[in-house]
C-alpha cells in the first residue's frame, strides 16, 4: 500500500516515523532545523495522518518496517538516516536490523519494543483515550485555549505540558481522533518485542525522557535489548515526545548521530 510521505528541504535523506495514535505532524518542532541540512521525509503509517487504514496490511512493527522500506524505494530513496518516536522508533530499529545497507544512522526517541515482558493485552483505558480524542476533536480548537483542557490532554504526556504550543496540542488531538490504525497497531505489538541485532557500523542513539509515563524506565527501557554500541541518553524534564519537550537537545543529538556514519 502507498503511504503518505511529505518532503522538506534538500541534502541527504532523513526519514521521520511517528508513534502510535500520532502522525507526521508530530515532527513540526524539528523539521525546520533538519530541513536546513537534510531532505526530510515524514511518514504517515497506515491508519494514521493522511494514510488510510488498509485492513489487509499487517500492522506489526516488522511488517510496517517492510512497508516503509518499499515506499522509500518507490521514491528512489535507497540510503537514509532514521529518526523514530515510540512505535516509529521500534519500526526504525527493525529497518536498521534487517536492511543495514540502507540505514546510515538511527536516532530512537522513546522507542517502543524495549521490554523484557511483552504486552499480552492492551493498556486498560486505551479505548477511553481514543474516545476522548474523538469526542474533543470538533471542539479542540476552542477548548485547547483553556489551561484545564490542555492539562487533561497532555499532563501525562509531557512534564512541560503548559509550555506546549497550541498547534502541537491541536495536531496531537486531531491525529489521535483520526487514527483508525491505533488499535490494529496495538494488537500488532502484542506478545512481541524488539529482539534483533543491529550492525555496529550503524550509529545509534536512544533517547528517553526522565518523565516518560507511557514507556516507564522500570518496564519499558531495557538496555540489553538495544544495540550494544548505542549511545543512551536520558533528558531531564522530558516525557514521551522528546522532540516536543527538549527540541534543541533532540536536534543536536540527531545531528551528532548523523555525523558519525561511515
How should each PLM-predicted stretch be described?
Residues 18-20, 80, 84-89:
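Conserved alpha/beta-hydrolase "nucleophile elbow" surrounding the catalytic nucleophile
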Residues 63-80:
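Conserved acidic catalytic loop of the alpha/beta-hydrolase fold
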Residues 89-100, 106:
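Short glycine-enriched nucleophile-adjacent loop
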Residues 97, 106-137:
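Flexible "cap/lid" loop of the alpha/beta hydrolase fold
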Residues 178-225:
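Conserved serine/cysteine hydrolase catalytic core
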Amino acid at each position: 500500500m502507498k503511504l503518505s510521505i511529505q518532503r522538506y528541504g534538500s541534502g541527504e535523506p532523513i526519514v521521520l516515523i511517528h508513534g502510535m495514535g500520532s502522525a507526521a505532524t508530530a515532527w513540526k518542532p524539528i523539521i525546520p532545523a533538519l530541513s536546513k541540512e537534510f531532505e526530510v521525509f515524514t511518514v504517515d503509517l497506515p491508519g494514521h495522518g493522511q494514510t488510510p487504514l488498509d485492513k489487509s496490511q499487517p500492522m506489526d512493527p516488522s511488517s510496517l518496517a517492510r512497508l516503509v522500506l518499499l515506499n522509500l524505494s518507490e521514491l528512489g530513496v535507497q540510503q537514509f538516516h532514521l529518526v523514530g518516536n515510540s512505535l516509529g522508533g521500534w519500526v526504525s530499529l527493525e529497518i536498521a536490523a534487517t536492511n543495514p545497507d540502507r540505514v546510515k544512522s538511527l536516532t530512537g526517541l522513546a522507542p517502543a519494543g524495549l521490554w523484557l515482558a511483552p504486552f499480552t493485552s492492551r493498556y486498560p483505558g486505551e479505548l477511553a483515550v481514543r474516545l476522548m480524542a474523538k469526542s474533543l476533536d470538533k471542539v479542540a480548537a476552542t477548548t485547547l485555549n483553556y489551561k484545564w483542557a490542555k492539562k487533561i490532554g497532555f499532563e501525562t504526556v509531557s512534564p512541560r505540558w503548559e509550555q506546549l504550543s497550541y498547534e502541537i496540542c491541536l495536531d496531537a488531538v486531531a491525529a489521535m481522533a483520526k487514527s483508525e490504525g491505533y488499535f490494529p497497531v496495538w494488537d500488532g505489538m502484542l506478545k512481541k518485542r524488539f529482539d534483533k541485532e543491529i550492525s555496529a557500523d550503524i550509529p545509534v542513539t536512544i533517547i528517553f525522557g526522565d518523565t516518560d509515563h507511557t514507556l516507564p524506565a522500570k518496564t519499558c527501557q531495557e538496555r540489553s535489548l538495544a544495540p550494544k554500541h548505542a549511545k543512551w541518553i536520558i533528558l531531564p524534564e522530558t516525557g514521551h515526545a522528546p522532540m516536543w519537550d527538549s527540541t534543541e537537545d533532540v536536534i543536536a543529538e540527531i545531528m551528532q548521530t548523523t555525523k558519525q556514519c561511515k
